[in-house]
Amino acid sequence: MASLKSIKKRIVSVKNTRQITKAMKMVSAAKLRRAQENVVAARPYAKKLGEVLDRLAKSQDGSSSPLLQKRISQKALLVVVTSDRGLCGGFNANICKAAERFIREKKAEFAEISVTTVGRKGFEFLKNRQKIHKNYGNVLSNLSYPTAALLAQEVVEGYVAEEYDEVYLLFNAFRSVMSQDITLQQLLPIVPEETAEEEYVPEYIYEPSKGELLDELLPKHIEVQVFKALLESVASEHGARMTAMDSASKNATEMIGKLTLQYNRARQAAITTELMEIISGAESIKG
């Protein structure tokens, strides 16, 4: 049986760890509220912009925009969004596994698949497994639209220059504190959504012209989609970390209870042994 001193030391250590996990849970909860508000605000704008683009693209048959043109797919770019920090359960591991699965399943379809990572954890996992086109580190802790726009612009420039023929975005979409959905989204070429034949599509008058608006809005659409995906990932990260730290705190409390019971039993055994020795000594003196 472990000594009283070692058990007491473990109890103190676990209590200190519980204090840290509780503090991290509270910090994540505060950050989650702000991140969730940002996601809720971004979703309607991204959706409406997508709807406007769908109408424009469908009414502009044979558009000259390279962002709408499908070409022979030989090279693909996968943008993988993870976090810069750990201690968030399976948040990063699940995305990295999904990235590996995508690469494995698409190998026959593409001659070359490159990966751009957003977040240090994804880069560390994939750097020795796959060709890394570029890594964006330490951008999620203080995420801003200009940062997301820069990433999107670089992706668009590479696509227009035919460095890759298709671009996919892999990220955790926020659903709730307990739930995040791994989402794979085709970013380029932009594919308008299918509209049911019976669905009424109103006609709009566009100025200066549909073509000019389309050329202006398509890059903006990519920027918005990237920004929304990063916001979703940040909210998912905080939700996953909050859940993980809550679970760790509960496990620590349970362990403290078991160690305390073990300590009390060891202490009781030590007292009993000491009493037996005293009684034995007294008996030997009498004898």
Swiss-Prot record:
CDD domains reported for this sequence: F1-ATPase_gamma (cd12151)
GO biological process, one term: proton motive force-driven plasma membrane ATP synthesis
Main location: membrane
Subcellular compartments: Cell inner membrane
Membrane topology note: Peripheral membrane protein
InterPro entries found in the cross-reference section: ATP_synth_F1_ATPase_gsu, ATP_synth_F1_gsu, ATP_synth_F1_gsu_CS
Recorded family membership: Belongs to the ATPase gamma chain family.
Cited PANTHER family: ATP SYNTHASE GAMMA CHAIN, ATP SYNTHASE SUBUNIT GAMMA, MITOCHONDRIAL
Subunit details: F-type ATPases have 2 components, CF(1) - the catalytic core - and CF(0) - the membrane proton channel. CF(1) has five subunits: alpha(3), beta(3), gamma(1), delta(1), epsilon(1). CF(0) has three main subunits: a, b and c.
The protein's name: ATP synthase gamma chain
